A protein has these predicted regions:
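Acidic/polar low-complexity segments and flexible, solvent-exposed patches
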Residues: 1-75
Length: 75
């Protein structure tokens, strides 16, 4: 799995999820339930991951949507 985005913006997480769902790219959102522990302060970022084989396509979809500035460095 490769990390695409790390953000505290839950609306952005939802939008990216919708873009990836629309392209039939399976993704995983990590740390989305950590707000229960942190008290909903938004301190801990949510991370969006995709399978290695979907990484290039997912990055292109986000870039096409104008979200390239949100992408994590591709390692």
């Amino acid at each position: 799995m490769r990390e695409l985005v790390r953000t505290n913006d839950i609306v952005l997480v939802s939008a990216i999820g919708a873009l990836l769902d629309g392209a039939n790219i399976h993704h995983l959102v990590l740390d989305q339930n950590m707000s229960i522990i942190e008290g909903s302060l938004g301190i801990l970022p949510r991370r969006i991951l995709v399978h290695d084989e979907d990484n290039t396509e997912a990055r292109q979809i986000l870039a096409d949507a104008g979200l390239s500035h949100e992408l994590r460095p591709d390692e």
